[in-house]
Amino acid sequence: MKLSAKTKICLIIGDPVEHSLSPAMHNAGYEALGIDNQFVYLGAQVKFEDVGVVVQAMRKMGIHGLTCTIPHKVEVMKYLDEIDETAKKIGAVNTVLNKQGKLIGFNTDWQGAVVPLEKITTLSDKKVMVLGAGGAARAVIYGLLRRGAKVKIFNRTKEKAIELAKEFNCLSGDLNNQEEIKDFDIIVNTTSVGMKPLENETPIPVKYLNEKQIVFDIVYTHAETKLLREAKKRGATIIPGIEMLLHQGTAQFEIYTGQKAPEEVMRKTLLQVK
């Protein structure tokens, strides 16, 4: 890596951010393409109230790319010059490109949800159970609907699921109606159940899972969450959260560099640094 004053800086901001695997993933991609003298990807812990200051610094210092993670994906939007239509519909930005001084916001989280599923199946007309109604769920729901899936949202607070379903013009369900779980083609968990301190819990009763289903857990703190382990025992096809991180990252990589991301190199790096 030969950095110079011409090297373009990309930065991930969050609070916290030290756990982020994105710098390792992106820098491995730059190295694989021989452009690690042109781009470097760093991390910075930024408090919520300082997001505007960071965006201003991006403008003044010519920082090339800004990745926003929790809790900055909505807050950053008010400081940008332009937001693409997808990010507007999702209501969050995870990627900012400095295009000759114009700051443009994108959302690649929806690709992180859709691409891993499409490697296994077509999404059109598939019945999908989405667990959760937070920011991550919004990107997942948008992507699934864009691909023609039949989405039903379930959330511990039922009112939030109803509200989100109205906004996206899809269905909401009741977690008490557990028998329904077995009827879905795909189940996507966007909740924090599976992360510490809930790593020994599952967001739904696993006895209803079966071999005809695909179970995708976007939690990536473990290679396999309890939900995925139990789904695998029952013959379901599983997708770990690392795939969501990878594919939102490859889409982002292409926005920042204008080049096709080296997917396998980036996946291998994520698995090594986890």
What spans do the regions from the language model cover?
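Phosphate/diphosphate ligand-binding glycine-rich loop within oxidoreductases
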Residues: K2-I120, E224
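Glycine-rich adenosine-cofactor-binding loop
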Residues: G14, G105, L117, T121, ...
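Conserved beta-strand positions in the Rossmann-like core of class I SAM-dependent methyltransferases
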Residues: L42, K152, I239
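Short helix-loop-beta connector
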Residues: K99, T122-K127, N210-E211
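Conserved S-adenosyl-L-methionine
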Residues: R146-K150, R234-T237
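NAD(P)-binding Rossmann-fold cofactor-contacting core
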Residues: R147-F168
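Rossmann-like adenosine-cofactor binding region
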Residues: K166-I238
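Adenosine-phosphate binding glycine-rich loop
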Residues: I214, I218-K274
